[in-house]
Regions:
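Amphipathic/hydrophobic helical signal segments and adjacent flexible N-terminal regions
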Residues: 22-89
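Mid-length scaffold segments of soluble, non-membrane domains
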Residues: 88-158
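Bacterial N-terminal signal peptides that target proteins for export
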Residues: 1-10
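Short, solvent-exposed aromatic-acidic interface loops
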Residues: 140-147, 163-168, 199-206
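N-terminal signal peptide c-region/cleavage motif recognized by signal peptidases
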Residues: 18-20
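An anionic, turn-rich surface loop/hairpin at beta-sheet edges
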Residues: 105-123, 160-186
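Edge beta-strand at a domain terminus
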Residues: 72-76, 175-187, 192-216
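A short, polar/proline- and glycine-enriched secondary-structure boundary/capping micro-motif
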Residues: 146-153, 169-174, 206-212
Length: 216
């Protein structure tokens, strides 16, 4: 009987631990100040592969004459190594415009994407940063809306973790609930009063998204 009880207890402990691990994976600690405690496993992988995303996206965009022309017209925005230390995004009103480079992100990796699109650019929309300290809120307006948190990381990068809201949805989905809606990227300063949010391997449409950010 003792062997049976020990086996049952061991199985119960394993089940509890597995359930706790699953709960953590589904519900990240969004109150943490360190982004590593918040980011999902999938988003940490996206961030680690940021340069791979740049290389693939630029190659795909340059393969089309129209995409190559857009890249050549703004070398600072589309240079992966164009990063200026200091002067991170402060609270205030901004304007944002997103460029989608390459294929179809997660769909492309799964082999279910349609043929790659070289480069798509969106219209300028209003965006804003709110709050003080090591964590600040960032949100954009428009049909496809980003909403999430900026985490201080280094003197040249801020980490963004958030979600994508679509159409007439009243509120953004909680982070960590849907891989396709989750967003993870770096905010980098690339010029005088000019930044970009780089999103490697997003869930929809592209290999890399580059959001240009300037004061309103």
């Amino acid at each position: 009987m003792r062997g049976v009880w020990l086996g049952t207890a061991t199985a119960l402990v394993a089940t509890v631990l597995a359930g706790a691990a699953l709960a953590h994976a589904r519900d990240p600690d969004t109150t943490a100040v360190d982004w590593r405690a918040v980011a999902t496993v999938e988003d940490r992988q996206r961030l680690r592969e940021w340069r791979d995303a740049w290389v693939k996206a630029l190659a795909e965009a340059r393969a089309d004459p129209a995409g190559a022309a857009v890249l050549s017209a703004d070398p600072a925005l589309f240079n992966p190594d164009q990063v200026i230390r200091g002067e991170m995004l402060k609270p205030g009103a901004y304007r944002c415009r997103t460029y989608r480079l390459g294929g179809n992100g997660a769909e492309r990796l799964a082999g279910t994407a349609p043929p790659p699109r070289a480069l798509l650019s969106g219209a300028w929309t209003a965006c804003r940063v709110e709050g003080e300290g090591p964590k600040r809120q960032f949100a954009t307006d428009g049909v496809q809306r980003a909403s999430g948190v900026l985490f201080d990381s280094t003197d040249s990068r801020t980490i963004f973790l958030g979600t994508l809201a679509l159409g007439d949805e009243a509120r953004p989905m909680p982070y960590g609930r849907d891989l396709r809606r989750d967003m993870a990227g770096f905010v980098e300063r690339i010029g005088e009063a000019r930044w970009r949010l780089v999103l490697p391997f997003p869930g929809f449409q592209s290999t890399l998204d580059v959001m240009e950010i300037v004061p309103a």
